[in-house]
Swiss-Prot record:
Chain's gene name: lgt
UniProt source species: Pediococcus pentosaceus (strain ATCC 25745 / CCUG 21536 / LMG 10740 / 183-1w)
GO molecular function: phosphatidylglycerol-prolipoprotein diacylglyceryl transferase activity
Bilayer topology term: Multi-pass membrane protein
Enzyme nomenclature, EC number: 2.5.1.145
Protein name per the record: Phosphatidylglycerol--prolipoprotein diacylglyceryl transferase
Amino acid sequence: MNLTLGALNPIAFNLGGIQVHWYGIIIASAVVLATILAVQEAKRRRIDPDSIYDLILWALPVAIITARMYYVIFEWGYYQNHVDEIVRVWDGGIAIYGALIGAGIVVYLFCRANWIPVWLMLDIIAPVLIMAQGIGRWGNFMNQEAFGRITSLTFLQSLHLPHFIIQQMLIDGAYRQPTFLYESLWDILGFIVLMSLRHKKHLFKQGEVFLSYVIWYAFGRFFVEGMRTDSLMLLGIRVSQWLSVILFIGAIGILVFRRKSMRERLPDYLEGNQLSPK
């Protein structure tokens, strides 16, 4: 195989002197697609579609800020000497767990204020969220980040990867494990599984689609994170791996507890929104 092409340009085009990055285009596309699918499902679950748009307008900027804050905090050794780069999110450097923390707080407050069951809203969001995560990893691909350990060209070719992926994994003179791809495929598979199962009658109580998402994502992220070389570290520990373990165990624990102790009181996911303002 002739591998003569260089790395892909992370900049898509220039607009009036402003560089538009593929990273931003890919993330924005993922958000738009996720919003469209969430609106469609909200209608089926008796939630005003405008609520989804309003929620996105609040949650998205908060998620971006907390995702960046999370990343900067764990990379403070670098950013304390490069303060001007803290706001440069278009260059990459946002953490999904940070985004989930910020967005989760917004979802809770928004739903309480608008008479929407929090668990139901999380169920609606979960499948499209993991889809957006899977798409978003291709932004990391364009920036040549979220890659894994050094590997060989022979190994990458054995995976039957397209030429452009193999060449993009040539970083600093060495081929790298395409961990972005592993996680992207895992996320997209999770999206397919959740979308296939969530409309099964009496299968999910409200909250269980979301908890299934957490279990699925945390399980895959733990193993992918172990292959990466750019993990955020704290006291020599991969932060995302520990968070994955906590979320995996926690979600299973909550799922079992709710099924055993609250099963008869939990509405089915398909029942949709049963709340109304007083």
